[in-house]
């Protein structure tokens, strides 16, 4: 296992955007009147695009006004502007001159940045001792990246005497705050017994924490742990997985290890490079099957760097010899514009060539073209015909689409029984959409006798595969006790899963559960967050709920204008119970306030048209 020490340099933007006031006319007036704090906030608003269009030039000018009045944070941001050349010409000397006063006033971000200037010799003479001093000042205030750098300085003896015990202490402080590089180096300390007793289990734990955050060196080290069985049971598959993750980030040692895995067949099938070499030799002699294989290797980047242009070239060579699988892959290239300019007409032509030879996937694709009018005039009858041909060969996607055709009466007379039959065929092959559809049929008695227990079973199968609609419906089953014993905890769990995938109804239900503490500890802040997500997607009940939040100050500051805004949107969206609240709030607001809100509401409906 190899040691990796890296000094991280660059601009850090630590202040959370949510903690700062957004741009507003009142804030701007304060700033123009000379209020230094307001000037800084206006600068940040322009810098971050918080309530106003990003404008680094404006940000720089407002930071300058505030910085010259002694606002520490503004001095730090002046340093950032000069360091990055944002809003002004890049000038490390000026960056250094602004970081310094902010650092001397105790701002940890500025202390880190000043240390970085000394470390890199930017804007000042390179001085590792000063760099260490300022990194340490920031680290002692809890800044994770500074703690990591102090650990590195102690480890390497940069700017201070080498001290593995201190290195360990600072790596641990940063690692416990989630810094991935520190977690990796802490793993190294445990692995090599530097500054702490050697402990492979602890080394594995910290490598894994960093690897799961995407740190390439930790992924490589974790691969070694699995490969050699250090701190964990030996597992070639896991070793391969982590080497691959690191290799795909460009880490040379991991790429070498990954090559070894392919070469000797550890954790992966043996010999992709050799396979590629022989495919190429045969393909160049005109064998259609091997031309296709070579094209596929280029297409998926297996054993060779991914190259859609080369994939297209080899698919075309094989397709022109009449190979169906190459013809439909060539169709894919044209359809998605991979290796060639997107061309639905050509995609349709090649799908048709393969479909007429009986290739099931091509038949499905041809049906898809007819259904969507891609490369051919839309024709549901033809779509149905080709979906059926593919479905009868067992193509799961075609079975799903054939089920849809029967369910909605597209290209064929509506027939819930047939829809159910084809959904079931696909569901039994494990397709999540089909499992969801089967559940829906059982829940509504469409094509089959209504059966809540079966509906629940199929929703669960689809939900466990991550299908969002099924996760929502499963939540409903648990919430209402349909097909399963009522269980608010499980209902909450599945609503949350669906909500996080963007299902508006699930977001509303999740907000409801947080609001009333059903299946989860009551939390108005979380309730507000999820109601807002649902409201933005047009759920009128959620819009009304937001109005209540702002009206009564639950989980958010009381704000009658915002309450009026959401009440009015919900009312115009069909939530008639909001009418009395709209009228009540109108009596509270001024004429100008009402006009402002009504204009905002009109804008909302322009960007959120009713379906």
Regions found by a protein language model. Give the residues of each.
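Positively charged n-region of N-terminal signal peptides that target proteins for export
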Residues: 1-4
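Bacterial N-terminal signal peptides
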Residues: 7-18
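Short helix-capping/linker turns of helical repeat alpha-solenoids
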Residues: 32-35, 46-50, 55, 63, ...
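Hydrophobic face of amphipathic alpha-helices that form TPR/SEL1-like repeat modules
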Residues: 41-48, 77-84, 116-120, 149-156, ...
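TPR/TPR-like alpha-solenoid repeats
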Residues: 45, 66, 81, 102, ...
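Terminal, low-structured helical/coil segments at or just beyond the last alpha-helical repeat
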Residues: 577-611
